[in-house]
Amino acid sequence: MEKKHQILDALNEALKLEYSMIIHYPLINRAIKDPDIKQMVNILGVVSIKHADTLADAITALGGKPQWDFESAPDEIDLKKIFRAQLEKEKLALKLHNDSADMVNDKVLKTKLEAIAKQEVEHIKLVEKILDLIDQGKS
């Protein structure tokens, strides 16, 4: 039972990270002028919706209740600060997905979590690219 509780906690924490991106996406997107960065942020937003759905389904399948919680919006729109924080969130999400995949016994769920983890690796690269573009004066 303790293991199941740990898995549900990790999945709900990951859900909060994904849901925060979904909720904050319009605010962040409106602040971006560069079309390349806008497109990359759009990818993050769309995939976050898919991840949140998968996580909510996994939580429910394990007998838990998805906690639809999210972080409050940033007080100021400092894109560099926002994406530095997003980079840390992507890294945490990767860890949570990998940890959850390691703990679950259900092969289908394990495969889904491993797939999300692989996508998080790509998100980390994408956010790093966004930060590089912001450092170059684009935003």
Features from the language model and the residues they span:
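Iron-associated oxidoreductase/ferritin-like identity signal
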Residues: M1-S139
